[in-house]
Amino acid sequence: KGGFVLKNTPAEREEAILKSKKHYRRFISAMLEITDNIDVQGKVQTPGHVITYDDPDPYLVVAPDKGTADFSDIANEVSEKSGFWLGDAFASGGSIGYDHRKEGITARGGWECVKLHFSEMGRNVQTDTTSVIGVGDMSGDVFGNGMLQSKTIQLKAAFNHMHIFLDPDPDPESSWHERKRLFEMQGSTWTDYSTNLISSGGGVYERQAKSIELSPEVKDLLGTDEENLKGIEVVRRILQMDVDLLWLGGIGTFIKSDLESEFHVGDQANNEVRINSSECRVNVIGEGANLGLTQLARIEL
């Protein structure tokens, strides 16, 4: 696991992408400079300027993920130019590999588990109307692919680090087509969702909003009599909703044990929205993301 942080990111998206690619090259090059290699005779070569205390280890691969998901070709290009023994097999995906998002590998695998859980309850998530809440957005690999696996789901609420999406009574068919449109749109966000396709009382809001006026439909959806709630309070209410499925397709830990403190979870960004396992009322949790629940919360649920 590793990564880098861009400082003074340009406001323009295209400039930001160019800058991130430039520094990604530096990042990958720096890693390869201190990594053991294998020569054409099959012998391990250790970089001469590196002091090592462990055994030779020339096996290094990268799996570009969120933020760098389209950078596989860059990593492989750097690998080949550096003479690294894996060449263009260094990074997964890319133009000569498989595209995680295009193939939907993670989401499809996770959805098989969802189908199994529902079948054990005598239901078919592929044909039965199924109410869903989710973490993520349609531009994402796991969330986006997951929310296209069934045409009979009703995605009633979702959120990511920026936005909150509320759709109290969605039409399964038209909402599926709209999600597909967003999935195919480059860099879409929840704000790109056609407002005329959102059911009465719903909408898209900022997660950091100081106050969101709640319609009667949303009050009923969230189970509250409050007239207004902060964005983070709405997110908490979403996680507490009584629905069929919670689809975890975004980064963060959102459910912990009652016995755990926020400090023990180690995900400060979501401290204000996280719920305890005793507050979780969904029938099935589908996790295509990573660490959506703490281990103790999993055991309790």
Q: How would you describe each model-predicted region?
A:
Residues 1-5:
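N-terminal amphipathic, basic-rich helices that act as targeting or association modules
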